[in-house]
C-alpha cells in the first residue's frame, strides 16, 4: 500500500512536468528509488515489473506499453490526485488499526505478567519440598547425566564459536576486497577528469602547508585502508576543499566543476555496485 502511494506521487509529478500522457518506466523507477520518503523508510528498491503490475491494477484498461514508455488514456490529473488521497487515507486507517492492536497487546501483556508473578509466589512454598525430595531420590542417576552434559557442552560450544569466527573473518575479507575495488575505481575515474586532476595537483605545490599535502597525497589514497565508503569520500572531499585554500577566489569556478565531477563519480560507482 505504501509503495502504491509513493508510485502515484512520482507518477503525478512526471505527468505534470511533462505535460503529456506518456511517462518513461525508467524515470518512474528512478523517481521512486530516489524519493526522500523511500530513502528514509529504507524499503527495497522497486523493480520495473512491480511498477507495471501496480499501474495495471490502479489504472485497468487505461494504459499501453511501447518502447519503455507507458501511455495513459482518458486520464485526468485530478483522477491521480483522488487516488493519492484514497491510498493516503487507507494507509492512515491501517496504521491507526495497527497501533490500536499493539496497544491492546501491550496492556494484555502487563496484566498477564502481574497475574503470573502472583501465582508463582503462592506455589513456591508447596513446590520446594517436593522438588527437593525428587532431587535426592534421583541424585545418583542425574549425577552421571550431568557429568556427561558438562563435559560435552564445551566441545559443542567451541565448535560453534569456531564456525561463527570463520564466517565473520570471511565476511570481513570479502567486505575489504569490495571496499578496495570501490576505492580503486573511484580514484581511476577521477584521474580521467581534467578539472579534478588540476585541483588535486595544485596543493602539491604548496610548500607551506605540510598537513594539506599529507592528507591529500594521491599515492597515500591509493593504499588507504577503508573502514567504510565515507572514509574515501571524506578524503576526496578534502581534496576539493583544500584546492580552494591553495587557489584563492580566482579559480573558484574550476573548483566547483571539480566538485561536480566528484559527486558524479561517487554516484556512478554507487549505482554500479548496487546493480
From Swiss-Prot:
Annotated organism of origin: Kluyveromyces lactis (strain ATCC 8585 / CBS 2359 / DSM 70799 / NBRC 1267 / NRRL Y-1140 / WM37)
Subunit structure: Component of the NuA4 histone acetyltransferase complex.
Subcellular location: Nucleus
Amino acid composition bias (Low complexity), ranges on this chain: 115-166
Purpose: Component of the NuA4 histone acetyltransferase complex which is involved in transcriptional activation of selected genes principally by acetylation of nucleosomal histone H4 and H2A. The NuA4 complex is also involved in DNA repair.
GO biological process: chromatin organization; DNA repair
Keywords of this entry: Chromatin regulator, DNA damage, DNA repair, Nucleus, Transcription, Transcription regulation
Region (Disordered) location: 107-169
Entry GO terms, CC: nucleus
The family this protein is said to belong to: Belongs to the EAF5 family.
This protein's name: Chromatin modification-related protein EAF5
Amino acid at each position: 500500500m505504501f509503495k502504491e502511494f509513493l508510485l502515484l506521487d512520482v507518477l503525478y509529478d512526471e505527468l505534470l512536468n511533462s505535460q503529456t500522457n506518456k511517462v518513461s518506466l525508467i524515470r518512474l523507477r528512478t523517481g521512486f528509488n530516489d524519493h526522500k520518503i523511500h530513502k528514509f523508510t529504507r524499503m527495497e528498491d522497486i523493480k520495473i515489473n512491480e511498477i507495471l503490475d501496480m499501474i495495471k491494477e490502479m489504472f485497468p484498461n487505461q494504459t499501453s506499453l511501447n518502447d519503455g514508455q507507458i501511455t495513459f488514456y482518458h486520464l485526468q490529473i485530478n483522477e491521480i490526485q483522488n487516488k493519492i488521497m484514497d491510498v493516503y487515507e487507507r494507509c492512515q486507517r491501517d496504521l491507526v488499526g495497527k497501533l490500536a492492536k499493539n496497544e491492546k497487546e501491550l496492556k494484555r501483556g502487563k496484566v498477564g505478567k502481574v497475574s503470573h508473578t502472583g501465582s508463582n509466589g503462592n506455589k513456591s512454598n508447596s513446590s520446594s519440598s517436593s522438588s527437593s525430595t525428587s532431587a535426592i531420590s534421583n541424585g545418583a542417576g542425574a549425577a552421571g547425566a550431568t557429568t556427561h552434559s558438562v563435559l560435552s557442552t564445551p566441545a559443542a560450544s567451541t565448535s560453534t564459536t569456531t564456525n561463527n569466527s570463520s564466517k565473520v573473518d570471511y565476511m570481513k575479507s570479502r567486505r575489504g576486497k569490495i571496499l578496495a575495488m570501490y576505492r580503486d575505481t573511484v580514484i581511476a575515474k577521477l584521474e580521467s577528469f581534467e578539472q579534478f586532476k588540476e585541483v588535486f595537483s595544485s596543493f602539491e605545490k604548496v610548500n607551506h602547508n605540510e598537513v594539506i599535502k599529507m592528507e591529500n597525497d594521491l599515492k597515500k589514497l591509493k593504499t588507504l585502508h577503508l573502514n567504510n565508503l565515507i572514509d574515501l569520500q571524506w578524503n576526496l572531499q578534502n581534496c576539493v576543499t583544500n584546492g580552494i585554500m591553495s587557489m584563492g577566489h580566482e579559480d573558484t569556478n574550476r573548483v566547483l566543476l571539480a566538485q561536480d565531477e566528484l559527486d558524479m563519480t561517487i554516484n556512478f560507482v554507487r549505482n554500479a555496485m548496487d546493480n
